[in-house]
Design a protein with these regions (language model features):
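Membrane-spanning alpha-helical segments of multipass transporters and channels
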Residues: 24-309
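Short, membrane-interfacial amphipathic segments enriched in basic
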Residues: 1-17, 204-211, 309
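Aromatic- and glycine-rich beta-strand/loop motifs that create alpha-glucan
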Residues: 4-38
Length: 309
């Protein structure tokens, strides 16, 4: 008997069934999604309470503000990475069975797992941003939207990275260990501690390829490096003139003597390397990492098989 097609169903039919299956699975797994929403709620209230009424115009206040974004970025990213590993690993068994019977193409599994994450990531990040953003004193509707979108892209990037490890490695435990080790290296080279300017030249290449540092740079530059026109320094009076209302335009108070006079924007860009002009290039790089992780996830689904014979 000869068959003209490898699979009985068309690609359109496969797509409909697999995408619906993933959407139903996510909807019927409240422990996964409610955990993300609960952590987003707790983190936003925690940071909002601690930094309520904070003054970011001082040297100590600005460093604390960047540290707040660093910790918030890290916690949101780690939540996305860790929580997706069990659900991705458990579904792999069904995928192996159905691939053996040629029920569905691996591409539609990849497509379904990609689509199912998007609404939940954007919704949980919106909850976080809606509470956190005004409570810590950040302003601006456009800045709010960009902050939410880029935080969501960070969540997608780490979620897809987790799926990639779950598909590529033999077990959930191995994926978790390897992922934590790699993310630990990323944390060191995100540009906050140590700051970008203090990273030794021999390790600059690690800083330049760390995915998390692009997201942190975007979020920090949005709120601390936004200044359309820097104020001018009056050398005679030793004061800044023509100071605009944006946070990035404000003079940095109580800065160390070796730093001298500077603004919030200049300090953020010079010390932490988080430049406002790089927001859009960095966003493209984050999207590039998302695509890269999805490609590796697809290749893992297609060519790797960790079943025990």
């Amino acid at each position: 008997m000869l068959f003209s097609k490898k699979r009985a169903a068309t690609n359109t039919t496969q797509m409909k069934f697999v995408v619906k299956r993933f959407l139903d699975m996510y909807w019927r797994t409240p422990t996964y999604n409610l955990t993300r929403f609960f952590i987003s709620l707790v983190l936003s209230l925690l940071f909002g309470t601690v930094f309520f009424g904070a003054d970011y115009n001082s040297y100590q206040g600005l460093n604390s503000g960047v540290g707040m974004l660093f910790i918030g970025t890290l916690f949101n990213g780690m939540t996305s990475f860790s929580s997706v590993l069990p659900i991705a690993s458990n579904d792999r068994a069904a995928f192996y069975r159905e691939r053996a019977s040629q029920t569905y193409n691996a591409f539609w599994y990849f497509f379904g797992s990609t689509i199912a994450e998007i609404p939940y990531i954007f919704a949980s990040c919106f909850l976080y941003t809606a509470i956190f953003f005004p409570m810590v004193g950040f302003t601006g509707f456009t800045t709010f939207i960009l902050f939410w979108v880029n935080l969501s892209l960070l969540g997608l990037m780490l979620t897809y990275m987790g799926q990639m490890f779950a598909y590529a490695l033999p077990s959930e435990e191995v994926a978790h260990i390897i992922g934590i080790l790699i993310i630990s290296v990323f944390i060191t080279f995100m540009g906050f501690s140590p700051p970008a300017e203090a990273i030794p030249s021999a390790y600059k290449w690690l800083y330049k390829i760390t995915p998390l540092r692009f997201s942190l740079s975007i979020l920090t530059a949005l709120v601390f490096a936004d200044c359309p026109e820097l104020p001018t320094w009056n050398t005679t009076l030793k004061v800044y003139e023509n100071i605009q209302s944006e946070l990035g335009c404000q003079p940095l108070a109580n800065s160390p003597v070796e730093i001298g006079h500077t603004t919030v924007k200049q300090f953020t860009e010079d010390v932490f390397g988080m430049v406002h002009a790089d927001i859009w290039p960095n966003t493209i790089i984050v999207l590039g990492y998302i695509v890269l992780f999805r490609i590796f996830a697809l290749l893992s689904l297609r060519f790797l098989n960790h079943q025990k014979k």
